[in-house]
Amino acid sequence: MALSFSAILHIIMMSAEFFTGITVNGFLIIVNCNELIKHRKLMPIQILLMCIGMSRFGLQMVLMVQSFFSVFFPLLYVKIIYGAAMMFLWMFFSSISLWFATCLSVFYCLKISGFTQSCFLWLKFRIPKLIPWLLLGSVLASVSIASVCIEVDYAKNVEEDALRNTTLKKSKTKIKKISEVLLVNLALIFPLAIFVMCTSMLLISLYKHTHRMQHGSHGFRNANTEAHINALKTVITFFCFFISYFAAFMTNMTFSLPYRSHQFFMLKDIMAAYPSGHSVIIILSNSKFQQSFRRILCLKKKL
C-alpha cells in the first residue's frame, strides 16, 4: 500500500512526539518513584507530577496506536480505534490528563497568588492535604466519562457515513452523532473552565503585586515577583497546549474531517503534541528536574 505525503509526514511527526513524550513522562515517573524509594514518602506535588507523568504516558501510547492503525491498517482503524476497549482507554486518558493539568494549575494558583480572602487562604494552607482527594476525584470523573462514551456507537456511526449516499440521511446522522459526542464530552469543559479561572487569577495577582512593588520599592523585583512570572509563564504555556488539545480532540470526535486527509493527520499531530510538550515544560520550569535530567543524559553518554 503506497503512503501519501501526508501519511509519511504524520509518521515522522508522531514518531518524534512519541519518543519525546515517552522520554519526558517516563522521566517524571522514574524521578518521583526514586524519591519514594529513598524517603518512603512523597510530597503532594510530587504525587501530582508522578500522576501527570503516568497519565501522559498512557495517552501517548493510545495516540500512537491510533496513528499506527490509521496509516498502516486503515480498514481496521474504525473497528479497533472506535471499539469499546480502545475508546474507553482513549477517553479515560484524555479526561484524566486534562483533570491532572487542572489540578496542577490550581496548585500553582493557590501557592503563588497573593489574594487574602479568607476562603482563598483556607484553601491555600490545605491544598497539600486536598491534592490526594483531587486526584481521586479526577480518576472517578474520568472513569465516569469514559464509561458513558463507550455507550455511543462510534464505529456504527462512522461506517454509516461511508455507506450512506443520500445527503439528507447523511446530514441527519451527522447532526445526531455530533450532538451525542458533544453531550458526552460536555463534562470536559468543567476542568477547562477551572484552568482558565486559575490562569486569570495568576494574571490579576501578578498585576497587583507588580503595582505594589512599583509604588513601594521603585520597581524592584523581589523573589515573589519572579515566582509569579515563572508560574505565569508555565501556566500560560500549559494553557496553549491545553486549548490546542481540547479543540483538536473535540473536532476529532465530531468526525467532520475526511478520513486520512491532510487535516485528519494534522489533528492527530496536534493532539500528540500535548502530552509530550506539556511534560517538557514541567521539566524546564523545575530546576531540580533539569539537574536530574542532565545527570541522566551524562550517564547515557558515558555508557
UniProtKB/Swiss-Prot annotation:
Membrane topology: Multi-pass membrane protein
TM region positions: 11-31, 57-77, 80-100, 103-123, 130-150, 186-206, 235-255
GO molecular function, one term: G protein-coupled receptor activity
Classification via InterPro entries: TAS2R (IPR007960)
Record flagged with keyword Glycoprotein: no
Main localization, broad class: membrane
Keywords: Cell membrane, G-protein coupled receptor, Membrane, Receptor, Sensory transduction, Taste, Transducer, Transmembrane, Transmembrane helix
Any one cellular-component term (Gene Ontology): plasma membrane
Compartment list: Cell membrane
Extracellular-side segments: 1-10, 78-79, 124-129, 207-234
Cytoplasmic side: 32-56, 101-102, 151-185, 256-277
Record family assignment: Belongs to the G-protein coupled receptor T2R family.
Function description: Bitter taste receptor that detects natural and synthetic bitter compounds.
Name under which the protein is recorded: Taste receptor type 2 member 2
Lineage: Eukaryota, Metazoa, Chordata, Craniata, Vertebrata
